[in-house]
Amino acid sequence: MPRIFPWKLWRKSRPAWPRFLGTHPMNLLSQLFAPPSPVPSPTPKAKKRSRRGVQIKTPAEIAIMRQAGAIAAQVLKEIAATVQPGMTTGDLDQLAEERIRSLGATPSFKGYHGFPASICACVNNEVVHGIPRRRKKIRSGDLLKVDTGAYFQGYHGDSCITIAVGKVSPQAQRLMEVAEGALYAGIEQVKPGNYLMDIAGAIEDYVKPTGYTIVEEFTGHGVGQALHEDPHVFNVRCRDLPNVKLKPGMTLAIEPIVNAGSRFTRTLGDRWTVVTVDNALSAQFEHTVLVTATGYELLTDRRLV
């Protein structure tokens, strides 16, 4: 999922620099300390560069995305049925990759900007982008989030579930229910003529009365030929940000993240795993959703696989 950064706060205005003095010192510093370019996804090598802007999918593209979404849904359904205490998140990653490939697709996540696995596996206070590890055991009472994507014939399907491992606490169970309810509250707003902020408002209004919080800096997104396409799909109402009108043929990944405590997060030393700042539990659900002529269609519906 994409992260929103306030770049405008970083780019402060400065007085004009005389050309005869050469390159501005700040430009030299920016070049010297610029972060390395992200590692491009290795799959597929012949992939065309994604078109800019919000994409309206053709019927042929939608048919392929149904298959990509069904593969992602099938893998998550099997993981949910397989996971048990004593397994490791690395075991689940191996299962996911083998099943994605056996179903004729490739993992969307593996190699994406250098991410080393086919799933993101987050336990308890971990929010997003958890790296699966062979030594990381899953225990009874854990709240396990598994996010995966399948790349099939040039298009992606993206979905996430939260799994209660064994018997979880009442608080964990309630958090799961709220996170999933928030997802479907947002999905119910998907129809032609509505706007992205209708989705965001429905999610926000669903979560706010519960006392839980929504992680604001991570958003949903468009999905298709690229794993992350325009537009950003916000989970809270935002001012001064694009409020796109929904049209048939749009495909969106809607994915609210709900915390039991503070909404704020921090990133661990592996530069991927994001956790809650107060170690509170976190839950997430995600579907890839198609805007149809009359409403919506879930492309990652686990009930249909």
From Swiss-Prot:
Keyword set, alphabetical order: Aminopeptidase, Hydrolase, Metal-binding, Protease
Protease in keyword set: yes
Annotated a divalent metal cation 2 binding sites: D158, H221, E255, E286
Cellular component aspect of the GO annotation: cytosol
Superkingdom of the organism of origin: Bacteria
GO molecular function: initiator methionyl aminopeptidase activity; metal ion binding; metalloaminopeptidase activity
SUPFAM superfamilies (UniProt xref): Creatinase/aminopeptidase
Cofactor notes: Binds 2 divalent metal cations per subunit. Has a high-affinity and a low affinity metal-binding site. The true nature of the physiological cofactor is under debate. The enzyme is active with cobalt, zinc, manganese or divalent iron ions. Most likely, methionine aminopeptidases function as mononuclear Fe(2+)-metalloproteases under physiological conditions, and the catalytically relevant metal-binding site has been assigned to the histidine-containing high-affinity site.
Catalyzed chemical reaction(s): Release of N-terminal amino acids, preferentially methionine, from peptides and arylamides
Record has Protease as a keyword: yes
One Pfam entry name: Peptidase_M24
Enzyme class: hydrolase
Gene3D superfamilies: Creatinase/methionine aminopeptidase superfamily
Known EC number: 3.4.11.18
Coiled-coil ranges from the UniProt annotation: none
Cofactor: Co(2+); Zn(2+); Mn(2+); Fe(2+)
UniProt function note: Removes the N-terminal methionine from nascent proteins. The N-terminal methionine is often cleaved when the second residue in the primary sequence is small and uncharged (Met-Ala-, Cys, Gly, Pro, Ser, Thr, or Val). Requires deformylation of the N(alpha)-formylated initiator methionine before it can be hydrolyzed.
NCBIfam families registered for this protein in UniProt: met_pdase_I (TIGR00500)
UniProt protein name: Methionine aminopeptidase C
Organism: Synechocystis sp. (strain ATCC 27184 / PCC 6803 / Kazusa)
